Regions:
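Mid-domain Rossmann-like dinucleotide-binding core that forms the NAD(H)/NADP(H) cofactor-binding site
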Residues: 1-48
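Terminal peptide-recognition signature
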Residues: 16, 67, 79, 120, ...
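Local beta-strand N-terminus motif with an aromatic residue
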Residues: 39, 63-64, 92
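Short acidic-hydrophobic, aromatic-tinged amphipathic segments that line or gate anion-handling sites
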Residues: 41-51, 152-160
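Short amphipathic alpha-helix with an adjacent loop that forms part of the alpha/beta core around
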Residues: 49-62
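N-terminal Rossmann-like NAD(P) cofactor-binding module of classical short-chain dehydrogenase/reductase
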Residues: 65-68, 96
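Glycine-rich phosphate-binding loop and adjacent beta-alpha segment
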Residues: 74-148
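C-terminal hydrophobic helical "lid"/dimerization subdomain
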Residues: 131-179
Length: 179
């Protein structure tokens, strides 16, 4: 999970664990948040490119099935070539691009896609049909209690919506309360 220290990434770690992922590898910049995650391995994105490439290469060699990327940007530019070069042959890696907190664009050599079974996918409004999106949302809502999913929230009265709406915080989600 690339970008596991934001609220969506932290939730993704919990969901992956609930769904039975054999090994969860989490990346992020905040060392304290990374350490608190229920991940099997953590990679701190504040390292230099050579160190990151080495860490991504080592994890890729251990067979990654799915990457959920909330960051895109520079970390994807370092991660994708490592996946292409070191992923064992025969099993594709699904790379799901969800967010772009680290940048909307990346530079990617076409050879990366030709040299390995990488499947790039997007997840967002439009990537799934409405019936599939509603079904998946329903499944996650049904799993929330037995999975004990939690996220950090900031409660705000509904009358403060105009002031609170533009304040985006990837660490906490704003929850509007009535009354």
């Amino acid at each position: 999970i690339n970008g596991a220290t934001g609220s969506a990434g932290q939730l993704a770690v919990q969901i992956a664990r609930y769904l039975g992922a054999k090994k969860i590898i989490a990346t992020g910049r905040n060392a304290q948040t990374l350490a608190a995650l229920d991940a099997d391995e953590c990679i701190q994105l504040t390292a230099d490119d050579k160190t990151l490439s080495g860490q991504f290469s080592a994890t890729s060699a251990a067979q990654i099935d799915v990457v959920i990327d909330y960051l895109w940007g520079h970390s994807a530019e370092v991660l994708l070539p490592a996946l292409a070069k070191y992923t064992p042959a025969g099993r594709p890696v699904r790379y799901v691009q969800v967010g772009s907190l680290a940048g909307a664009d990346i530079a990617l050599n076409g050879a990366v896609l030709r040299s390995a079974p990488l499947v790039l996918m997007g997840s967002g409004i439009g990537s799934l049909s409405m019936p599939h999106l509603l079904a998946a949302t329903g499944e996650m809502l049904q799993a929330a209690v037995p999975g004990k999913f939690t996220i950090a929230t900031t409660p705000r009265p509904l009358q403060e919506i105009a002031a609170a709406w533009p304040r985006d915080d990837s660490q906490k989600r704003t929850v509007f309360t009535l009354g």
